[in-house]
Regions:
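Residue-level recognition of pore/gate-forming positions within transmembrane alpha-helices
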Residues: 6, 135, 151-152, 235, ...
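Hydrophobic alpha-helical segments of integral membrane proteins
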Residues: 11, 15, 22-40, 85, ...
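Membrane-water interface segments at the C-terminal ends of transmembrane alpha-helices
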Residues: 132-166, 192-198
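An internal, D/E-rich "acidic patch" concept
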Residues: 23-108
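Hydrophobic alpha-helical transmembrane segments of membrane transport/permease proteins
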Residues: 1-34, 45-54, 157-180
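Alpha-helical transmembrane segments of integral membrane proteins
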Residues: 93-98, 102-126, 142, 158, ...
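Short, hydrophobic secondary-structure boundary micro-motifs
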Residues: 1, 44-46, 76-78, 145-146, ...
Length: 319
């Protein structure tokens, strides 16, 4: 893979030894975990070649020929580009994070507005129409929605929308004067990625708000003569937000992992394009690093949601 089809056995064996692929799977797994943890142990009997690869570190001590070092997590080197995986992911992850944040923001704002309006108006026709649209939005695959959005708004209606089928956050100037920020390239990927969470947030807001408005405390607030806006927004909506926050947090975390197809269709330079390219070239360190990064983001988002719960619902606060 790295040496081509005409590589000799000696070169292949040398590469396997350099990458540690000649070790047992258990030893490779332990070595990978050792590279990830902040305090690591490295054998320096043959020199500091391993330490030189990991970048900055602080040597805490030495036990025999084993050095104890303090460092940032080391995700290895890419097989293809010979660059650090952390650098590759560091360049791509901000674009994915921005795309996911804009998508979930669109879904949150529009979903709350539409859900509140349909719950307040609450007519049979409007409920059926909302259910029909949200069902289509939830059942539409992301890759098909991306192709459809790119074809309609980036190709057929390009003269009216001014949007391109592909493009990233920064576009290279056609006269060679460098890169410039192009936020319009964010519109189609963000709308496409926000379709499914928008449908979920809309339906959850509507059903949760209808249930909350039938509670006794809402009837009491109305009986006291409070304005309808205050009753809905202060009393009913606040208690109806718990399932919405749960859905938004889950979707935001999944957008970080599930934006692969959308990014690939729109050529958005994020984690998705990096993962697809790594899969195509069997670049396993990049794949493992991307999976690990997404898993860490899932954990962090869930922790953040638990903290937000305490502000929304005092009943779940830890005393």
């Amino acid at each position: 893979m790295m040496l081509g089809q005409r590589a000799d056995k000696e070169s292949v064996d040398a590469i396997r030894e350099e990458l540690g692929l000649n070790q047992s799977l258990g030893k490779q797994y332990v070595d990978y975990l050792n590279d990830l943890v902040p305090i690591s142990f490295y054998d320096v009997a043959d020199g500091n070649q391993k330490l030189d690869k990991i970048g900055r570190y602080a040597r805490l001590g030495t036990i025999g020929s084993t050095a104890i070092v303090l460092k940032a997590p080391y995700l290895r080197m890419s097989y293809q580009s010979k660059r650090k995986v952390s650098e590759i992911l560091g360049e791509a992850f901000p674009n994915t994070l921005l795309l996911a944040f804009v998508s979930i923001s669109i879904a949150m704002v529009l979903g709350l507005i539409i859900g509140i309006l349909t719950a307040v108006i609450n007519t049979n026709f409007l409920n059926k129409l909302t259910l029909f649209i949200t069902t289509i939005g939830m059942s539409l695959p992301s890759f098909f929605a991306a192709i459809l959005m790119a074809w309609i708004f980036g190709f057929l209606l390009e003269h009216w929308t001014g949007l391109s089928m592909t493009g990233s956050l920064y576009t290279v100037d056609e006269y060679g004067r460098g890169e410039f920020l192009s936020l319009r390239n964010l519109i189609l990927p963000a709308l496409t990625l926000g379709m499914r969470p928008l449908a979920v947030v809309t339906e959850l807001t509507r059903t949760s708000l209808l249930e909350a408005m039938s509670m006794d405390y809402v009837r009491t607030a109305r009986a006291k003569g409070l304005k309808p806006f205050r009753v809905i927004c202060i009393h009913a909506l606040r208690n109806a937000l718990n399932p919405v926050v749960t859905a938004v947090s889950g979707w935001f975390a999944s957008l970080l992992a599930g934006a692969v197809f959308v990014e690939y269709v729109f050529d958005w330079k994020g984690i998705g394009v990096v993962v697809v390219d790594a899969l195509d070239k069997y670049d396993f360190p990049v794949i493992m690093g991307a999976v690990l990064l997404i898993a860490v983001m899932l954990v962090l988002v869930n922790i953040l949601v638990d903290i937000i719960y305490g502000f929304i619902d005092p009943r779940v606060r830890i005393s």
